[in-house]
């Protein structure tokens, strides 16, 4: 039971980032690896601005993530730089930016106000459920509205969107800004739960996000072809929950933590290699 609760809590921390990656990876069809750095950016901005108040720090972090997404969009504009390369380049630069913000590799936020202390609760499960419920509603409204339709059109056929007289690059910017804003929000949640922001805390989260999206679709949407926003979001949750349950089980049975990423990498490789190319 403890394994499930721990996995559920970790999944809820990561879910905003997974939903953000879903928007970039599945909706826009852009493999945006920038979230590795944006995740740290959110935690860094939160840790530095928390003296101004909890909600101010959350807003500053999300805005910082959104700005980073718009910069990455500008780098990709009119095929100036390949999306994958743009993400790698952005991460390369973000390392210095995050260090400049933090002024040191690690910042403690212990003793600072958090969602847990504001709500006067004993564990993180309830605050995480509340904030994720709010985010899911927002993402559902987005995906079911005109903006969601145009974002999907961008991913399906950008040239068709241009032929219809729509500002395709604007939708790229909006999609990547929302995606990176959600990644930054996850960084703030992680900093609050763990009690610190660290310059290396984002290593590999983009790959975990892509793996969770694909695994969730294989488990829950394997034979479903029609787009259903609620089912897509639920599949993202199933995917990240499966990942953290697997992680908890491996630790519980005594697997050396040094080998965890190797084993989980093999699992992700098998999952990715078994998916049709058009579903990647």
Curated annotation (Swiss-Prot):
Record keyword Transport present: no
Compartments (UniProt record): Cell membrane
Swiss-Prot/TrEMBL keywords: Cell membrane, Membrane, Transmembrane, Transmembrane helix
One Pfam family recorded for the sequence: BPD_transp_2
Bilayer topology: Multi-pass membrane protein
Cited CDD domains: TM_PBP1_branched-chain-AA_like
Positions of transmembrane segments: 3-23, 52-72, 81-101, 123-143, 196-216, 233-253
GO molecular function, one term: transmembrane transporter activity
Highest rank taxon of the organism: Bacteria
GO cellular component: plasma membrane
Membrane among keywords: yes
Record-given protein name: Uncharacterized protein RP368
Classification of source organism: Bacteria, Pseudomonadati, Pseudomonadota, Alphaproteobacteria, Rickettsiales
């Amino acid at each position: 039971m403890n394994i499930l609760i721990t996995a559920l809590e970790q999944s809820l921390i990561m879910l905003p980032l997974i939903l953000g990656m879903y928007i970039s990876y599945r909706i826009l069809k852009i493999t945006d690896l920038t979230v590795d750095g944006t995740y740290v950016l959110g935690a860094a901005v939160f840790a530095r601005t928390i003296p101004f108040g909890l909600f101010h720090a959350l807003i500053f972090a999300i805005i910082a993530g959104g700005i980073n997404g718009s910069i990455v969009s500008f780098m990709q504009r009119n095929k100036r730089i390949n999306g994958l390369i743009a993400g790698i380049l952005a991460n390369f630069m973000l390392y210095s930016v995050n260090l400049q913000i933090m002024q040191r590799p690690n910042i403690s936020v212990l003793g600072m106000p958090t969602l847990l202390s504001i709500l006067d609760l004993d564990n993180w499960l309830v605050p995480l459920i509340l904030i994720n419920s709010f985010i899911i509603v927002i993402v559902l409204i987005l995906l079911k509205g005109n903006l969601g339709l145009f974002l999907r059109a961008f991913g399906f056929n950008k040239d068709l969107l241009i032929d219809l007289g729509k500002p395709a690059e604007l939708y790229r910017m909006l999609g990547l800004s929302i995606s990176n804003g959600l990644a930054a929000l996850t960084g703030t949640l992680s900093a609050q739960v763990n009690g610190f922001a660290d310059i290396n805390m984002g290593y590999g989260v983009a790959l975990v996000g892509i793996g969770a999206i694909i695994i969730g679709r294989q488990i829950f949407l394997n034979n479903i072809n029609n787009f259903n926003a609620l089912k897509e979001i639920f599949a993202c949750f199933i995917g990240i929950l499966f990942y953290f349950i697997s992680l908890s089980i491996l630790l519980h049975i005594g697997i050396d933590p040094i080998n965890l990423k190797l084993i989980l990498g093999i699992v992700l490789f098998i999952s990715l290699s078994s998916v049709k190319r058009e579903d990647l």
